[in-house]
Amino acid sequence: MEKTQICGPERNSYAKTDHDATFMRMKKDYMGNDQLLPAYNIQIGVADEYIAVADVMQYRSDMDCFVPLMEKFHELYGFYPRYPVADAGYGSFNNYLFCQEHGMEKFMKFPMYKKETTDEKYHDDPFRAVNFETDSEGDLI
């Protein structure tokens, strides 16, 4: 069987023992080593302390799992949740746009939120583009 038939259009790897699994970087083990292992991304949506929706996905990033999970929620209940709350791992322009298009409030921080709001070293670094000084016309000084 050809690799593209096994992987499909959205993946670039597969495990020989489980063709549906995608290689993902796992957390460090007790020796402090990262591991690249075949795995799945499990997503669970909770409403009022009850599991409302769950899904198993092949995407490595949580960011890519948000829209399919919300679509599954909509398929099950006939509406989108009004206030989907998620951590910064889900924050992306596409996810914010999806929320806006479907009448959902955006309760997801963007990926650099903590660093941009609390990290003094980040704000004091003169070589970061966000810290470049501009004049009144917006030109770099």
Q: PLM ranges: what are they?
A:
Residues 1-141:
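Anion-binding and metal-coordination hotspots
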